[in-house]
C-alpha cells in the first residue's frame, strides 16, 4: 500500500472518508515498528521528485498499512529531514496524541473499578475533549493513580506512570486508530515452531541478570493513626512473615544464589491505616501485614517471567522463515528450538517491523520485553534493589 497524506486539520472521521491530499508516488521505504506496550512508529523515505515532496509538513498525517491484520493506521508526522537525494519522514501512531491531553487536577477519586469504568470516570479530569474510545476484557476492579499524579497525560494514565492501568491491571495495549484496548492477553498460541539453523537467522540471549531475583522484600509508607489523640503520621512498614522473615520467595527463579528485590508498595497501600492503641500496640497489625503480602504476591504473579528468567531475544530472517509466520501478530506465542542440547522455549512476539510497501513483515523479535521490570524498579523502588 502506498502511504496517503492528510492535512493537519483533518477531522477524526476525515481519515476514513477520503484520500486526503493524495498518495505519495515516489516512496522508496515505508516501515512500521511496533513493540509490545511500547513504541508504534513510522519510518518513511521519499524522493524529492515525489508529487507531495513540497507539500508534506510536520504535524500532517500519514495513513498506511501497519500489519497484515488491521485496517490502515494513522500516524502523525513529527520530523522531516531533507537531503539532496531523499526526504526522510518520521511519524508516530495517532494514539500518541493522548500524551498531549493533560490532567488539570490529579485524576483520582479513590474508588476501585474495572478498566472500562475507570476510563469513563477519569475523563472529567483532563483538559481536552477526548476523541479516543476504550475497551477492555479485564473485569477485575482496582484503584489506579494517586494524589501524586499531578499533570499527567491521558496516555500516562494508560501506561507510563506508577499506578497507571497497565501498572495496576497488567495486560497488553492494542491500538486501532482512535480505539484503544487493554487486553489481558494480546495474541494467541500459534503452534508455529522456529528452529535455529533452519529458519532462525540469529539468536541472542541476554547475559545479564540485573532484573532476576529469588526473593522480594516488600515495604510501604502508610498512615499511622494514634488512637490516643487521633493524630496521623507516616509509618515505614516492612514485611514480617509468620516466621519473622522479611522476604517472600519468588518461585521458579533461574538463579542458584539468593538475590533480593526491595520494593516500595506505597502507591498500592494508600487506603491502609495502621491503628496504634493507647497501650502502644497495633490494633490491626496482622491485617496490614496480610495486605502487604497480598500486594507483593500479586506483583510476583504479574511479572513472574521478568523476575525469574533471563530473556532470550531472537531475531528472525523472514525471507528464510516459514511463510505462516507472516500471518502472526504482535503478542502471538511461538515455539523456539535453539538446537543445542534440546533447548526449547515458548516466546511471545514482542516487536515487529512491517514493510508497508511490500505488505509483509521484515523483522520480528521474540522474547521478554527488556523495558519492563527494570524501568519500574527505577521509578518505584525508592529504597534501592
Where are these regions (language model features)?
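Short, surface-exposed secondary-structure edge patches
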Residues: 49-55, 322-327
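Solvent-exposed edge beta-strands and adjacent loop segments
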Residues: 1-37, 195-209
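Short conserved beta-strand and strand-loop elements enriched in small hydrophobics
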Residues: 5, 58-68, 331-339
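Acidic, low-complexity/disordered segments
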Residues: 89, 227-290, 294, 305, ...
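Surface-exposed cap/loop segments at beta↔alpha junctions
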Residues: 51-138
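Short beta-strand-centered interaction patches in the first periplasmic/extracellular domains
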Residues: 2, 9, 76-98, 136-225, ...
Amino acid at each position: 500500500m502506498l502511504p496517503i497524506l492528510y492535512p493537519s486539520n483533518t477531522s477524526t472521521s476525515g481519515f476514513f472518508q477520503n484520500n486526503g491530499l493524495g498518495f505519495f508516488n515516489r516512496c522508496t521505504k515505508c516501515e512500521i515498528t511496533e513493540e509490545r506496550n511500547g513504541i508504534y512508529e513510522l519510518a518513511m523515505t521519499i524522493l524529492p521528485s515525489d508529487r507531495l515532496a513540497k507539500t508534506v509538513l510536520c504535524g500532517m498525517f500519514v495513513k498506511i498499512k501497519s500489519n497484515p491484520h488491521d485496517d490502515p493506521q494513522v500516524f502523525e508526522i513529527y520530523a522531516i529531514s531533507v537531503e539532496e537525494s531523499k526526504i526522510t519522514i518520521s511519524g508516530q501512531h495517532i494514539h500518541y496524541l493522548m500524551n498531549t491531553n493533560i490532567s488539570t487536577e490529579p485524576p483520582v477519586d479513590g474508588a476501585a473499578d474495572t478498566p472500562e469504568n475507570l476510563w469513563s470516570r477519569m475523563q472529567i479530569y483532563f483538559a481536552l475533549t477526548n476523541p479516543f474510545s476504550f475497551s477492555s476484557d479485564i473485569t477485575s476492579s482496582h484503584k489506579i493513580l494517586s494524589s501524586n499524579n499531578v499533570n499527567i497525560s491521558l496516555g500516562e494514565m494508560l501506561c507510563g506512570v506508577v499506578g497507571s492501568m497497565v501498572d495496576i491491571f497488567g495486560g497488553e495495549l492494542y491500538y486501532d486508530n482512535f480505539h484503544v484496548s487493554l487486553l489481558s492477553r494480546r495474541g494467541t498460541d500459534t503452534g508455529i515452531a522456529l528452529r535455529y539453523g533452519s529458519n532462525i537467522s540469529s539468536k541472542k540471549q541476554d547475559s545479564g541478570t540485573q532484573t532476576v531475583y529469588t526473593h522480594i522484600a516488600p515495604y510501604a509508607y502508610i498512615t499511622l493513626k494514634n488512637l490516643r489523640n487521633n493524630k496521623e503520621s507516616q509509618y515505614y512498614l516492612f514485611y514480617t512473615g509468620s516466621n519473622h522473615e522479611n522476604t517472600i520467595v519468588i518461585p521458579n527463579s533461574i538463579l542458584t544464589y539468593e538475590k533480593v528485590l526491595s520494593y516500595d508498595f506505597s502507591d498500592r497501600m494508600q487506603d491502609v491505616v495502621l491503628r496504634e492503641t493507647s497501650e502502644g500496640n497495633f490494633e490491626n497489625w496482622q491485617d496490614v501485614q496480610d495486605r502487604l503480602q497480598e500486594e507483593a504476591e500479586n506483583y510476583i504473579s504479574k511479572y513472574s517471567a521478568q523476575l525469574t528468567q533471563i530473556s532470550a531475544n531472537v531475531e528472525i530472517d523472514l525471507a528464510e522463515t516459514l511463510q505462516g509466520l507472516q500471518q502472526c501478530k504482535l503478542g502471538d506465542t511461538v515455539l523456539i528450538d535453539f538446537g543445542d542440547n534440546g533447548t526449547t522455549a515458548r516466546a511471545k512476539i514482542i516487536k515487529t517491523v512491517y514493510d508497508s510497501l511490500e505488505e509483509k513483515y521484515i523483522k520480528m523479535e521474540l522474547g521478554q520485553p527488556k523495558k519492563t521490570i527494570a524501568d519500574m524498579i527505577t521509578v518505584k523502588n525508592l529504597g534501592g534493589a
